A protein has these predicted regions:
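N-terminal cap/lid segment of alpha/beta-hydrolase-fold proteins
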Residues: 4-34
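The alpha/beta-hydrolase serine catalytic core
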Residues: 25, 88, 135-224, 228-235, ...
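Glycine-rich His-Gly loop
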Residues: 43-47, 119, 211
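Short beta-to-alpha linker loops that shape the active-site pocket of alpha/beta-hydrolase fold enzymes
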Residues: 47, 76-81, 145, 239-240
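Catalytic nucleophile-loop/oxyanion-hole region of alpha/beta-hydrolase
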Residues: 78-108
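Short beta-strand immediately N-terminal to the catalytic nucleophile in serine-hydrolase-like folds
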Residues: 115-117, 142
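Gly/Ala-rich beta-loop-alpha elbow adjacent to hydrolase catalytic centers
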Residues: 117-121, 125
Length: 262
C-alpha cells in the first residue's frame, strides 16, 4: 500500500473499547467526521485474524471515501487480536457482536447498519441472524465458513490436534494469533448446524462472494447454501480464501460497496 494511503488510514482510524456486561471489546473506528456519520458498517474478521488485518483497512478506506457519511467499525472477537479472553465460546462471540451493534446505533444515532463478514466472521454473522433477527440493511459475506467444524478439523488442525481434542484436551491453532480451542467449543459448532437453517426472510439483503480456488472452506458448499436460500452468489474465478490477488480483492470490495448502496 502506498505511503499516501497509510497517511489517510492513520488519520481516519481511532481505537476505542466497549466495556459493557463484563466484556472489553477492542475496536477500531474509521470515519472522516464522527459528527457527520449517517451509517455504520460492522466488520467481522475471520478465525485467528484481527481488527488490524489490512483487508479491513482497505475496505474501510474505500467505504468511507466512496460513500460520504459512512463509518466502519472493526473489532476483535474473543481470544483474537488484543482480546484478553483465553477460551473461545460461541455465545460470547454473539455477545460481542450484539454489543458492537448496540454501540454503533447509540453512538451515531442511526439504524442504518451494514455488515461485512469474512470466513469465521461470516459464520458468526449468519448465526447471529438466525438467533436474533437481522439488524442490518445489507450483509456481505466473503468466503463464509458455513461448516466451521469441518474447516477446523479437515484443514486448519493437524492430526495431532484432532487426537488431543478426541482425548478431551484443548489445542492451540491459528495464524496471526494462536487460539485455544476446547472440545466444548467443537461440540458447540456441531450443535449449531448453520447449513440446516433457513435464511429466506433475509435473502434479499445478503450477498455472498466466494473464490473458486478457496483452499480453506468449500466453494461448492457455499454455492449450494446460497442456491437453497435464494441468496445472491458471486463466484470469483481463481480467488483463494484470503483473496491475495489485489485486483480480485479490489473488485470484491467494489461489488460489496455497490451492494450496500443499491
Amino acid at each position: 500500500m502506498a505511503s499516501f494511503d497509510w497517511v489517510i488510514i492513520k488519520r481516519m482510524a481511532k481505537y476505542f473499547d466497549i466495556n459493557e456486561q463484563g466484556c472489553s471489546i477492542r475496536c477500531k473506528l474509521y470515519c472522516d467526521d464522527p459528527d457527520a456519520v449517517k451509517r455504520v458498517a460492522v466488520c467481522c474478521h475471520g478465525f485467528a485474524s484481527s481488527k488490524e488485518s489490512t483487508s479491513y483497512q482497505t475496505f474501510a478506506q474505500r467505504a468511507v471515501a466512496k460513500w460520504k457519511g459512512t463509518a466502519v467499525i472493526v473489532f476483535d472477537w474473543p481470544c483474537h487480536g488484543e482480546d484478553a479472553r483465553k477460551n473461545l465460546v460461541l455465545d460470547e462471540c454473539t455477545s460481542y457482536l450484539r454489543l458492537v451493534v448496540d454501540y454503533a446505533k447509540s453512538r451515531f444515532n442511526t439504524d442504518e447498519l451494514y455488515a461485512y463478514g469474512v470466513s469465521f466472521g461470516g459464520y458468526l454473522l449468519l448465526k447471529y441472524l438466525a438467533e436474533n433477527g437481522n439488524p442490518f440493511r445489507k450483509v456481505a459475506l466473503r468466503c463464509p465458513a458455513l461448516d466451521m467444524h469441518r474447516a477446523l478439523i479437515d484443514v486448519i488442525m493437524t492430526s495431532d490436534d484432532v487426537a488431543k481434542l478426541e482425548a478431551g484436551k484443548p489445542v492451540l491453532i491459528g495464524f496471526d494469533r494462536k487460539v485455544r480451542i476446547s472440545p466444548e467449543f467443537m461440540d458447540e459448532l456441531v450443535s449449531f448446524d448453520l447449513l440446516s437453517r433457513e435464511f429466506f426472510d433475509y435473502a434479499d439483503d445478503i450477498l455472498i462472494l466466494h473464490g473458486t480456488a478457496d483452499e480453506i472452506v468449500s466453494f461448492d458448499v457455499a454455492r449450494q447454501f446460497a442456491e437453497d436460500n435464494v441468496i445472491e452468489f458471486v463466484a470469483v474465478d481463481g480467488a483463494d480464501h484470503r483473496f491475495h490477488d489485489p485486483k480480485k480483492m479490489d473488485a470484491a470490495l467494489a461489488r460489496i460497496i455497490d451492494f450496500y448502496r443499491s
